[in-house]
């Protein structure tokens, strides 16, 4: 299979892979311990519902002031599996992507035969989509089905503020466009511009996060999707295989949620 991400370390000698942006400070000790403990449970199937992990995620965000229930959470085998499930669940005919941007969105949209329009970001404005807000809104027309946006952007690192994100999500709701907000790098940001607080008001909003980056566990494969739209959640769940999140991944995820002090410290240091 042709490599589409990373430095292809399994076929090449790579000393420093700058294409994989994970926490250089490594895996928290408590998460390592949880993964080690998980081996004792490897002789059984994992909890198909991921009940403990969903509960931990919902309780964490509720403590942060966001009204997230366990049923709003769908864990997956990394964010990439969730992006693919979202594409198959919604079956968009036309999508808009920011460029430069994460290739994974194009990959899943091509898999469902979706036409893609690219909104080109300008280096002179630090790749800010907000600098050309009107032009972006003009591109997000009634015949658009889905819009993917990473915040902060991968690979540019641009962090859009809450005002811009709310404007875009609101515009897309009027046009009946789903917005997939990829917040996989939000944990590194001292300013929290997450759109999680908007979930209750915007049923077109889907948020995807992962434990990969901040906790330096890309090999574990663990991400999660959040949405208040029950129909969307049901369709996404139907497009995921059973037991898609291993025992090790579930226990690692719960340990990551418990390591709140680690995340705050590492976000500041990195």
Q: Predicted segment positions?
A:
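Conserved core segment of the aminotransferase class I/II
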Residues: 33, 206-262
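Conserved beta-loop-alpha segment that forms the PLP phosphate-binding cup at the N-terminus of a helix
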Residues: 50-54, 69-93, 223
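N-terminal "arm"/small-domain region of PLP-dependent enzymes with the aminotransferase-like
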Residues: 1-45, 56, 177
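Short acidic capping loops at alpha-helix termini that bridge into adjacent secondary structure
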Residues: 67-73, 94, 143, 176, ...
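Active-site phosphate-binding strand-loop segment of PLP-dependent enzymes
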Residues: 124-190
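Conserved small/polar residues in nucleotide/adenosyl-binding loops
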Residues: 263-270
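PLP-dependent aminotransferase-like
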Residues: 88-149
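Conserved N-terminal alpha-helix of the aminotransferase class I/II PLP-enzyme fold
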Residues: 37-76
């Amino acid at each position: 299979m042709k490599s589409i991400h990373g430095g292809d370390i399994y076929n090449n000698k790579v000393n420093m892979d700058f294409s994989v942006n994970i926490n250089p400070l490594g895996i928290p000790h408590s998460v390592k311990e949880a993964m080690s403990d998980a081996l004792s449970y490897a002789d059984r199937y994992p909890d198909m519902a991921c009940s403990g992990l969903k509960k931990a995620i919902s309780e964490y965000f509720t403590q942060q002031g966001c009204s997230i229930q366990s049923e709003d959470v769908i864990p997956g085998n990394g964010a990439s599996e969730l992006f693919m499930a979202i594409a198959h669940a919604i079956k968009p005919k036309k999508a808009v992507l920011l460029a430069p941007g994460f290739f994974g969105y194009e990959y899943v949209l091509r898999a469902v035969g979706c036409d893609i329009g690219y909104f080109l970001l300008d280096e002179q404005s630090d790749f800010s989509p907000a600098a050309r807000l009107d032009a972006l809104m003009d591109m997000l027309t009634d015949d658009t089905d889905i819009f993917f946006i990473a915040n902060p952007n991968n690979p540019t690192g641009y962090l859009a503020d809450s005002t811009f994100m709310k404007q875009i999500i609101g515009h897309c709701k009027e046009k009946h466009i789903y917005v997939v907000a990829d917040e996989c790098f939000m944990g590194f940001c001292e300013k929290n511009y997450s759109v999680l607080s908007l979930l209750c008001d915007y049923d077109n909003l889907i948020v995807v996060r992962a434990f990969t980056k901040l906790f330096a566990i890309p090999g574990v494969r663990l991400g999660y999707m959040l949405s208040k739209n029950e129909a969307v959640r049901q369709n996404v769940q139907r497009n995921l295989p059973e037991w898609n999140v291993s025992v090790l991944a579930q226990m690692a995820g719960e340990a990551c949620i418990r390591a709140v002090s680690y995340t705050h410290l590492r976000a500041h240091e990195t």
